[in-house]
C-alpha cells in the first residue's frame, strides 16, 4: 500500500491529487491494472471531476453547502456534522483503471481529495494491483 499525506488549507476545498497518484504509479511500472484509492477519514472524501475549469469545483462546493449547511441543526454537536454528511454523499474511495502505466481518466478528469472539515492533515491510501 502507498500513502499520500495532504495538508489542507481551508475548511472546505477540493485538492487535485492526480499528479501525486501518477508519480507513485510511474515508480511501480504497472502496464495494466487497477488503482484503488481510499481516504480513512469521516469528514473528507474523494471524487473524479473536471480539472480544467476551477469554477466546476466551486459550483460543487456551493451546491453541497446549500444541501447540507454548516450551521444547520444536527444531533451531532461537535461542529462538523455537515462534514460527515457531505463526505458520505461524495464517498471515500475510487477505482481507476491503469493502462500503459497511466491512469485511465477522461481528457478533463482529475482526482480530488474533498475536504469538508479542514484545515487538517489527510491521508490518502493507494493500492495498485497489476
Regions found by a protein language model. Give the residues of each.
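Active-site histidine-anchored catalytic micro-motif
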Residues: 1-130
